[in-house]
Amino acid sequence: MKQYRPDTTCIHAGYTPGNGEPRVLPIVQSTTYTYDSSKEMGDLFDLKADGFFYTRLGNPTLDAVEKKLAALEGGVGALVTSSGQAATMMAVLNICHAGGHVVCSNAVYGGTFNLFYKTLHEMGIDCTFVSPNCTEDELNAAFRETTRCVFAETLTNPSLVVTDLEMFANAAHAHGVPCIVDNTFPTPINCRPFEFGVDIVTHSTTKYLDGHAVQLGGAIVDSGNFDWNNGKFPEFTEPDESYHGIVYAEHFGKAAYIAKARCHLMRDIGAQAAPMNAFYLNLGMETLALRMERHCSNAQKIAEFLEQDDRVAWVNYPGLESSPYHELAMKYMPHGTCGVISFGIKGGREAATRFMDSLELASVVTHVADLRTCVLHPASTTHRQMTDEQLKEAGVSPDLIRLSVGIENPEDILDDIKQALEKATK
């Protein structure tokens, strides 16, 4: 397919109907697929041929969405999963095993922090957390001989720190390991991490990519740029006995990482997305570019208002010139960051609660990044499993309100915020 600009790619990539075929991506709601001979089926199981034989490993609807995601990010392949957490876990387990080590930003989504801090530790994988604001020397000091990857979020949730992608990627490569980033908040419309040296991207597709809070899902996208032949990753360069001795780096070339994630981990873990969810995700992605433009313009307007209001103690939005991350945002996301703002109002945690309870248009929900404006208090919800010290290190203060600005008329959103501020600060 011709390489189009991102907004056109959102609509057309992944699925090209033939003569007399449906114009809209069909839902192939089937677990299995028929073939004329046992040999054809055997070749599929041995990875000697392309095709679908069981939806856990591939499905026409999922395949179209994966191709669209890969095209948007500029990668060689993608794998959709049942959730963003599944994508993060599989992205790491694909290259890191018991006895291994990961370097991870400490300013990440609470569930991601617990995955690295607790669950992977119980599986024998250690993690060293670093601040996304760390210096190059501090970052390099976190590596060990057993380090197998670096993980960070492009824009951290909910503290909205802009990660220096080139610094993290360069450090990873200097130690012979790939850099993985979660690109959920900016989406490939606003940031393409592969252009800055990142090797693997993950997404919670539940958020902006879907955009309507309809489907739960995740994705892994492979740039195809990392060289697995450096001696640190024998799982790619030595025979996999569970697939009759296939060597992923030889057989799949630049797509070795994403092929192994599908053939090995998805086979064994089974965290596959449902075809219906992939269909909804595709519908959402068709309007992604339009929605992100509105999310960002609305958020900019709201952030500028909050910055000037005396009842507001502080505001963090990378689009503001006053943000300490504005320069990095302009480097990595020059056309906009996302629709999420973090801020605190005078009166602390109690005032934050009164503010959220007073909102009429915006909803208080455990969600972020869909077309409806919503708010959340992360310290008592998404990050409540973290200690006070961990919250501080992650940039989640007790008064932090996470405001996910939707695509409603910005004046209506402003009116709602103004009346809630009035009630919260009486």
Identify the residue ranges that each predicted region occupies:
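N-terminal "arm"/small-domain region of PLP-dependent enzymes with the aminotransferase-like
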Residues: M1-N59, K67-K68
